[in-house]
Design a protein with these regions (language model features):
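Short acidic (Asp/Glu) and glycine-rich catalytic loops that position anionic groups and cofactors
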Residues: 1-4, 46-51, 222, 268-272, ...
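Catalytic-core signal marking the mid-to-C-terminal active-site face
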Residues: 3, 10-23, 31, 36-43, ...
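Short beta-alpha connecting loops at secondary-structure transitions
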Residues: 6-9, 273-280, 308-315, 342-354
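Metal-ion/cofactor- or nucleotide/acyl-coenzyme-handling active-site neighborhoods
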Residues: 314-328, 332, 345-373
């Protein structure tokens, strides 16, 4: 017999979420969203239940919204059904230098390769961790995918990937590489709160409609800036924007499936008015996650929380406290996928050593919540009776057989006493994490097949010479 799972209860109930859903449907039908793209407007205009008004405002009847929700598809990989998932990275431009502890630097190609290898060694998913700023801008996203395909089993290869494809030409190179490498390809559209889109982003999506690629919708309203000041009001706007955006995709992208991105599902960002900064890891952002999880269940969206985000600038006590509390409370609510591991300063910095510590924190929580058996065998009544008063269990057969599985043996959070720690060099947690990160990178072995690698090289060499690709990144 198993012990009952530990859980946190409370928060949004079904009646309250029904009300938010009704509000979102009303907003879709009576307020609408701005879609600044004539080609997409023309497609939408052909549907009954779509109303196009001046200024490219589009409104959707509730039945179209409900159909979009019904037809949404979430191709969660098999490993995500059994494992705790860590998504590591969101294309940062600054990182900590593993060879010079504490030194911040601009990310380069070598950092991209090393962090991809590190993430693969830790079984992480998600997008490329850093942007190689030593590479021309029009090649950066192509190289980020190429390196991920070549050196990682899961990175840029499942529903947890969320990288931009900044131009149609760039998207097509990545699409071609994904086919060669046998990797997943999808295109994402970001809504710009409140209720609008970037015209260029829509143009890329429009040109991809005949390619049969999955498309996802995401939005990130900011409380008090691009959405109401209350977090619950911001979440209400987020639900509206997600439902409207998904409906648009479901009507225009009929050659493949569409979905709400689990990476930012029902997002609502907290914003500090004193410093004008995003405050991931804050009390308010954790509050957002407590709204997000039940809404994901309500709409059947896979749960992925940003519990690994912190506003701390270094791998320090603040970072550990924010991430530890956020991870534990969301895990108690049922989350088993955690995003943004390795990020510091609310996403401004990437840190390989912090990724290693993030993994340890998640493993810590996982071991707290692992299923526990309640049985006569585990109560050990006979053992208690067999050991006389003042005796010891240390030499008992049961102790020898079970101590390794009864205790978690952490990689970083070691249980040494003071003397043992001093004999081991008195290293800080930061240094332990750096050493482990470098060791994992050195020992990493996965590489894509040679034949596929050669094809990827050819595609990348062609991209280097493509003037049209380069011009697509120019700002006139």
């Amino acid at each position: 017999m198993k012990l009952e799972d530990y859980k946190v209860t409370g928060g949004l109930n079904k009646e309250q979420m029904d009300k938010m859903h009704e509000n979102a449907l009303w907003l879709c039908e009576n307020v609408g969203i701005n879609i600044p793209h004539q080609g997409i407007i023309n497609i939408l205009s052909s549907y009954n239940g779509v109303k196009v008004e001046s200024g490219n405002y589009v409104k959707f009847k509730p039945e179209l919204v409900m159909n979009a929700l019904k037809e949404a598809k979430y191709d969660v990989p098999e490993y995500a059904k059994d494992e705790w998932i860590i998504s590591a990275g969101a294309h940062q431009t600054a990182c900590y230098d593993l060879d010079n502890p504490g030194r911040l630097k601009e990310a380069e190609e070598k950092d991209l390769i090393n962090f991809i290898k590190l993430g693969d060694a830790l079984d992480t998913v998600g997008s490329a961790p850093v942007v190689p700023l030593d590479i021309p801008a029009h090649l950066q996203h192509i190289l980020m995918h190429k390196v991920a395909y070549e050196n990682s089993r899961r990175r840029c290869n499942d529903i947890y990937e969320h990288m931009d494809k900044p131009s149609y030409e760039c998207a097509m190179y990545i699409h071609e590489m994904a086919k060669v490498a046998g990797k997943r390809f999808a295109f994402g559209i970001w809504m710009i709160s409140p209720r609008s889109f970037d015209a260029k982003n829509l143009e890329i999506a429009y040109k991809l409609l005949d390619k049969g690629v999955p498309m996802w919708i995401a939005t990130m309203p900011v409380a008090g800036v691009s959405s109401p000041i209350t977090m619950i009001g911001t979440i209400q706007q987020s639900v509206f924007e997600y439902l409207a955006g998904l409906t648009m995709l479901n009507l225009i992208n009929r050659k493949s499936f569409n979905y709400i991105s689990p990476n930012d599902a029902f997002e609502g960002d907290a914003f500090d008015m004193k410093y004008s900064t995003f405050i991931y890891g804050s009390v308010e952002y954790t509050e957002h996650t407590l709204y997000q999880i039940p809404l994901c269940r309500y709409y059947n969206v896979p749960i992925m929380t940003k519990a690994a985000l912190t506003n701390s600038k270094q791998p320090d006590g603040q970072a550990a406290a924010e991430i530890g509390m956020h991870t534990l409370i969301t895990a108690l609510m049922g989350a088993r996928a955690f995003r943004c591991a390795g990020l510091l300063s609310s996403g401004e910095i990437y840190s390989g050593e912090w990724l290693v510590i993030n993994k340890e924190i998640v493993d810590y929580v996982k071991n707290i919540l692992k299923p526990q058996e309640f049985s006569e065998e585990r109560l050990f009544i006979d053992e208690i009776a067999a050991v006389k008063a003042g005796g010891s269990f240390i030499g008992r057969k049961s102790t020898m057989q079970l101590f390794r599985q009864e205790y978690w043996m952490p990689e970083l959070f070691t249980h040494m006493n003071l003397g043992q720690w001093q004999e081991a060099g008195s290293k800080s947690m930061w240094q332990y994490a750096i050493d482990r990160a470098k060791k994992l990178i050195t020992r990493h072995t996965y590489q894509i097949d040679d034949d596929k690698k050669k094809e990827l090289d050819k595609i990348y060499e062609a991209a280097k010479k493509d003037k049209k690709l380069e011009d697509s990144f120019r700002i006139y």
